[in-house]
Structures are given as C-alpha cells and as structure tokens.
UniProtKB/Swiss-Prot annotation:
Residues 176-186, 205-216, 573-588 have a biased composition (Basic and acidic residues). Together with dys-1 and hlh-1, participates in a common muscular function. It comes from the Eukaryota. Disruption phenotype: Mutants synergistically exhibit progressive myopathy. Overexpression of dyc-1 in dys-1 and hlh-1 double mutants, delays but does not prevent the progression of myopathy due to reduction in the proportion of abnormal muscles. Also, reduces the locomotion and egg laying defects. RNAi-mediated knock-down of isoform b induces a dys-1-like behavioral phenotype consisting of hyperactivity, exagerated head bending and a tendency to hypercontract. Signal peptide: none annotated. This is Dystrophin-like protein 1. One of its GO terms (molecular function) is nitric-oxide synthase regulator activity. It comes from Caenorhabditis elegans. Residues 176-254, 506-606, 641-753, 804-839, 853-887 are annotated as: Disordered. CDD domains: PTB_CAPON-like (cd01270). InterPro entries: Adapter_Engulfment-Domain, PH-like_dom_sf, PTB/PI_dom.
Amino acid sequence: MPVRKKHGPYDIIADDVYDCRIPLHNELAYQHGIHFEAKYVGSMEIPRPGTRIEIVAAMRRVRYEFKARGIKKRPVDITVSVDGVKVVLQRKKQKEKGLSWDESKLLVMFHPIYRIFYVSHDSQDLQIFSYIARDGASNTFKCNVFKCSKKSQAMRVVRTIGQAFEVCHKVAQDQMQEKHEDEAAKSKISMQSEDEAGPNALDVIEERGGREEDSRSSSPMEAPPVGGPLYGKRLSLFQPRKPSTTSSSGGTAIDTTAIPENVLEIPNTSHPILQPKAPELVPQLQPQTALPYQQKPQSLLNIQQQQFNTLPSQMPSTQTLPSLSENPGQSHIPRMMTMPPNMPYPTATLPHPRTWAPQIPSYPNSMQSLEQNVPMYYPQMPGMLPSSSSLPFGLSSPVMVSPYATLQLNMQSQQLDQPDHSGSQITMDQYNQQLMRSQLDQAQQSVQVAGCQVQLLRDQLTSETTARLEAQSRTHQLLSANRDLLEQVQNLVSRLQMLETKITSEIHHSSSQPPQHQPIYQPSTSTPLNPKMPLSIDHNDPRIPGNSSIRLNYPYQVQPLADLRAGSLPPVKESKERRKDEGTRTEPESNAEDTTDYSSSDQYERTSNVMKPSHFNILMSNPLVDINVPSGAAMSSRMEQFDMGDTPGTSSTPPKKEKKPSSGILRGENFSRMSFNPKLGREKEREQQQLMFEDTLEDDSPRSIPPSPPSKARNTTIDSLFKPQDDPPTIADREPQQLPPQPSQQNQKKNTAVNLLMPTMPASSSLVTAMYPPMRQPAVPVNKIQPKVDVFRKKTLKTLSMDIAEEPEPSEMDPNRNNLPSSTNSSMKRRGFLPPPNTDVEIKEIEDYINRNVDRSKLPETSLLTRLTRQAQGDNSLGNLPNGYPQ
C-alpha cells in the first residue's frame, strides 16, 4: 500500500509503490496482456515534441480544449502486451448483455510498442496520463490523454507501458539470436553434405601444388611469385567461420601473393559460342588455397568481345585461361565449386562483396587495385554487375534499409546448380532499368531525409519564435507595470506638492492677520492697568507664528500633528470664529479635528501641572535642532516686563462669560475626549495664567478692605472645630485690619517669577516634538518653592482660621510669626494656591508645627485644644496662640 503523502502534492518516493529498477509485472504477463480501466479524454495531432515541457503542454492543451468543447470522457479498457497498446470501449452491461462481442466496432486505437514515442503522467494531476504515438500512415504524432480513478493506477499504467519497452526489446533480441542459430545450423548441414560429396578435393590440391609456380611465371596476368607465409599449408575450406565485418576484413593481414588461379567449368546454353563441347572457363582467385587445374592456352579476346560489350577491348594476346582438365569428355559434366557463404573475403572498397552474388567468389583487392587492365570475366547471370568497383556504396547488398525503414530492396538470386533457361534470363537493358530504378529510389529517400531535416529546422524555428514572443510579451507586461507605478508615484508627488502649497498659503494667511486678544476686564476702581500688561499670553504661544518667525523652507513647523495625521488641512476660518470656538468643542466640525489618539505619552504628559516650554523635550534631547521658538529666558523677561508695568489698584474677580447654550447633539454639554487638537487645553491654561496674574496684581496693589460688620461670638466646641463649615466666612465678614508693610518690588518680582510657571502643552501638538519619544521629567518649578506646608495648613486648619472672629493686633503678635494679609490669604484660598512663606520661618516636621511653643511640663494646660477652648470662652490667661497657627 502506498504511504500517505507528507511532503506536498507530489512525492515521488511515497507515490511509487515499488522501486523503478524492480519490474512491476512478470514478463510472461505481457504475452497475454495486462488490462486497465480508465476514461479516454481525447487525442490531438501535435508536432514532434523535443522536450518534456512541450509534452506536458500538449497534454494539458488536449484536456482544456476537450473540456471547453464539452466532450465527455468515455470509459475504456487499456490492454498492454508485447503486440502493443490497445484501447477498447467498455460495453454497457445492461443494453448489450445479450449481444455478441464485436471488438472491431468498439476498438478506439491500437499502437504497436515500437510506434509509441513517449508516455508520462501529469505532475499537477496524478490521475492524468498520456502517451504519444506515431501514426504509420500519415507519419504524424498524436497525443492520447486518459484519466484514471486513482493516482496510483495512473502511475502503474505508465510504468507498465515503460516496462513493455524493455520486454519487447528482449523479445526482439531473442528472436534475432534464434534466427542466427537457425542459419548456422542450416549452413553446418550443407557443409556436411558437401564434404561427403567431394572427399578427394584435398588430395587433388596436394598433387597440383607443384604446377602452380610454372603457371604463375608464364602468365603475365598472374600475381608475383608465391612468397606468402600461408602458401602450401593444408587448410580446411569447409570449416565454418565467424562472419566478417568491414572493420575486421579491412584490418586482416592476408598475403595476396599466395592466391593462385582456379578454373571453374560452368555450362551455358544461352550463347552459341559457349557450347557444352567448349566449356566456359572462368578465372577464379582463391584465398590462400589452390585447386587442381590444368593450363590450356586459349585466347579470350573473341569470347569476351562477343559476349560483353562493356568489357575493356584491350586485352593481351598472350593471356590464357586454364582448364580443369584436358579431357574434352569431362567438360560435359557440370562441376560446381562448393564454398561456404560465410567465408571471409578481404576488401577495402566495398564492405559486402559477397552479398551481391554469393554463388560466385569475388576477386581480392590486390587484383582490382594493382592490375586495372586485367579483364574480369563474369558469366551471364541475373542480379550481377560487370565489376564490383563500378558499384556505388550500399548497392552490393541485396537488402537496402532506408533511414526510416520504409523501403526495402530485395535482390533475387539463383543457384548455379539450377539449369538456366532463355525465358528466365534478363538482358542488359533490363538490368540497366533495374539499376536506374534503385538509384531513383535512393534519390527519393535522400529527398525524404532532406525534407525531414527541413521540417525539423522549421519546428526549431517555430519554438524559438514562440519563446521570443513570450519573452517580448513578458517584457511588455513589466514595462506596463513600471509605467503604472511611475504614474502612481507622480500622482503622490503632485499631491504632496499641492499639500505643501496649501500649508504654506495657510501659514502666510494666518501670519498676515494681526493677533486679537481677549477683552481685559477692567476693575471697578478708577485706577487703570498699564496697557503694556496683557492678562493673556496667547500671542506668545510658540504654536502661533509671528511675522518674523515664518520660514518658507519649513512649511510644517507650526502645523499641529492632528491635522497632519488626518491627511487634510485645517479649515480656513476667521480669527473671530477661532476665538469663539476655542476650548473644548461640543461637536467635531471636520475630519481633521475629529482625530483621537489614545497614546500613553500624551496622557502622562498632561498629568503634570508644571508648565514647561513648548519644545522642552526636543530641546533637552537634541539642542542643535533649528526651530524658531522663544526660549524660557525670553518668557521670563517678558514676565518681568509685565511686573514692571504694574500700577496699584483694587482687584476683584471678573465675571465669567456666560456661554450661550449651543444647539447641538450634546446641547451645551462639554464633549471631553482625548485628542491631538491643541485648542482643547488653551482655555484652562488661560484661566490659570489669568488667575496667577490677578494674584500678582492683588499682591502688588494696596487694598482697602471695607469694614465688616461685627460678628456674633459663637460657642466653639471640640466637635465644631473638626466639622466642615457650611457657610465659610468671606472677606466682607472679617474685621478690617491694617495690612503689614509690603515688601520691596524686587522681592515681589522674585515671588512672581517663582509663581509663574511655563505653559504646558503636549509634545504631540507640534511636528518637531512628535517625531521624538517623549521624556518623563519630574514636575519641578523653575525656582524652588515649598508650597507643601502651606497647602497642608490650608487643608487641615481651615476651620480653625475661619472660626476665630477676633484677631489680635499686629503689635501683640509674636514677631517670629508669618505676617500674611488676610485678603491675600482669602484670595489664595479661593484659588487653591498659597504663596510660599518667608525664608526666616522654616517648618520641618508636622510635630513641630502642632506642638510649637507648648510647655511639655504642663501638657494638659498648654495643649492646643485647651488653649483654643479657653480662648473661645474669653480666657486669655494662657496667652496668644503659638507661632505658626493661622488667625
């Protein structure tokens, strides 16, 4: 069973059931045939394929075309045997159950094994296999495609047909070997019969050996004297030998000087010259042996001129033909020289001298090359040529095989022992016609070979043209894709240029408009403020460019990151609409403003209340960045200019603007969210800055507090000391008191510089700082301040300072105590901020703060609660409150 595939759609190791080197079937099974069931897809005529890619392409083209035409697959039976591959339609068992089996009607195709060109399966779909066969009639190739029900079955069919090639090759080799064995057996039987017919042949050779030298010396046409190493040896003429080939015969060293002349007597009744009384004498050269003969001088000139007109006319008059015997009575008995057909004859010009006429022994090469003027005598026999040297190469073979095995020339031969008749012999004209016909057939075959070569060149040219066209189409596709990409890049560049143009124009438009400030609230007193002192520093915000801070090479230097992330520009509005829409908005107005970023960096940047410069993070991390923003020193100098222009006056809390209820979805409610919009936190910053400036103005200007009406003394208890007051007293409820002397202006400037903190803004509101990671820094003010003790005193002892109605005079107060005006404390309490204490007073611990000026020897009497209770009852025996407690 095949192993389940684990390496993808095609695994040759897992799909092959057995090793390819092991035969799949027994060879005897191919004699009967191996049957398979499959579905026949279709066939199509294709050119001769050269590569596997062309074969797979032809297979898939057949599948797709037959599927597009809607031709259904037909179930067939495939039989693979040594005869070939036979495809037969399957019978329908229900309809044709009673009918006889007629295979001729159901036969689809039959191809012998030697006509099958290629067989393979599709690597993508293992159920599909095909084989390409050559049609014998049209000499074309057809691709036949089949589909099996299982992948393993398709592979078994392919391997079965592949094994059939080997089986047929072995069968052909066995048949050839059997044929050679039969021929060898027949030749052996014939040689044994001839040996029994002429037992005295060897004795005659020994007796006639001495006469051979005399005949060679007296005859000019004979070879030089015998001097070969094999002369005079007794050799058997009837021993079978191995057939000679061109290479073996050409390389064999045989001494031609040891070849004598032999006389063969052949009766011929077709010519009146050659009568039985005057038997025909044929000169015969035997290799390395001699036959018994008798020399009889006779002229051959007249005989040869009368018999053949194609032989050379110049003949030496001294040439004689030997005879076998001088007895004329023996000439009537036809004698035939018996020689085995597989006798080797060396030659260099023609590889097969014995195959043209095996009945007549041929001359060796030495006689054909050395003595060209010697006439070679041939009897008048069918299928023979006057001279073997005049034949072209290949015509001496009786069977001619064309390169495509389509033409075979079988030459007829006759035995010498059969009597010749005048009706069965052909004339010289008929022989010439036969020769011309064979030459014509050879020319036709040459033309056919040339045509096949031309067709092959055409196919190669077609495949190369197709490949070049495919390469050109692929190049065209790549060029079109590159063109599309270039167009997209050009569109992006044009869009970026348009955005830069719009941003630059927006910057110029915003810088050309004069900055408009919020209306400053005028106090109720007649003393006006200095016009140089603005209550809002919105125009000093580095996010808003001035006339001199615009740089054309930095178009994004003042663009908020929210607008850049949204991919659009902020809407163009008038300055009045911007002032109206500042702060937290109820509804988003555009896609650019409706951006929400829940980044953690923006969250912890907003947690600190310490106001930092606009680009504090980027300046700390990279101080070499060229950004045109005001530094902290410039901001502090501006604050000092504001302090220098202060004039004394009264201060009061300006009334807040009443916002009209907006008609929106939220109906006036604030839409709080996390966003990169820098306008959302500006209102809080302005309020904080305005309160800080008002604090500074209140501290600088002398105030006249109106006298408060006398308040009723309340009974102060311990419970009431630690309960929050429902109605805290205001400044008007307090008694007027004389303010302590104000400190100098320089000290006040110092305190103001301490209280003023730099405005806070997230790093993501600017493009320059948004590209760098934010830096967490502790919330430390510019100048070290210590508001912790005051805040603690405000929160813990608020009720104590509120419940005391009568405050002691400044003369009675301890000189070490902090002297702070009540109006300053009330304003600080109202705003949640207290100025730092003086440097001469230092409170380190809470215990020291609570138990100050307490006599520890008299703890029950000098404790804080005892003092407060007695003071509330009017008992001032314990003295004033300790230093550090609020009044």
